[in-house]
Amino acid sequence: MVTVLLFPGQGAQKVGMTKDLAARFPEALATLESIDAALQTSLTQLMWDGPEAELTLTHNAQPAILAHSVAVLAVVRDRLGDVVAAAGHSLGEYSAWVASGALEAPAAARLVRRRGELMLEAGEARPGAMAAVLGLGTAEVELACAQGAIETHGTVVAANLNSPDQTVISGDPDSVRRAGELCQAAGAKRVLPLKVSGAFHSPLMEPAVSGLREALGATRFGHPAFPVVANATAGFVETGTEAADVLAAQLTSPVRWVDSMRRLAERYPDAQWLELGPGGVLTGLLKRIVPDATCVALGTASQLDAWMAA
């Protein structure tokens, strides 16, 4: 049986993350130590002991999520069998490139730390907002965004196309608020404002792109052992030379998660799916996108023990 790997993005960070993994699996501890060395700081201590307010800052949360994912990857890598593709949600795409063998984990940690810093700076220069729209189709959400942008003379876009009935919108605060109102008028069940430090995956992140391109250009990407599905295009990226372009484009482009999952399911209809990292959010989304898919979330020591014993 072939395997598809999924890697989560920001939002699943919490104090105590990876502590059970490090205590149970030497490979996980070694991975965390290598990332601490690369960042020249004890990210591990912040993940284990907090404070939560500091861990939640985007330039800490992003490398923390990546560290968790690649620590799990280090534990399961020799037990995965035939991995045919990987995808990661937003910053999770960096973890996917690590899994492919094209990017070393310490280099990936430095990249996402820089990515978080640049995104924070862009958010401070032009404050933005994001909101999750539940229970409304993507086309209706996109229509509400277009109308909301016109009415407020601002920017708001569908930023994360997470499932057929869950879309995150992003942009100027007034425009996001108005688009959310229009979504509710169109029948959305709920519109939930998100706690974020900027309008991620929208044109408001444009000031961060050049700095990220510079960091990506200074990073070596090798040839991947299997393709990575890019958020920005939902296409299969099969060479390391393309990685920098798709990762830079991701900052201002929507996360095309629904299309990505459908493309993977079409190419690999009999695959087993594994989500490596904290939270298990992608496992839930996959069931709404590809109901027949079987996905196992592996983020804790107990989950790994159960999976390895099966």
Label the model's feature ranges:
Residues 1-142, 194, 272-306:
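FabD-like malonyl-/acyl-CoA
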Residues 10-12, 37-41, 100-254:
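Alpha/beta catalytic cores of group-transfer enzymes, especially the acyltransferase/condensing modules
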Residues 148, 306-310:
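Short amphipathic alpha-helix with an adjacent loop that forms part of the alpha/beta core around
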Residues 154-156, 271-274:
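Glycine-rich, flexible loop segments associated with nucleotide phosphate handling
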Residues 203-206, 286, 308:
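Short secondary-structure transition/capping segments
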Residues 258-261:
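Polyanion-binding loop/helix "lid" in catalytic or ligand-binding cores
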Residues 264:
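Small/polar (Gly/Ser/Thr/Ala-rich) solvent-exposed segments
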Residues 267-269:
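Long, low-complexity C-terminal extensions of enzymes
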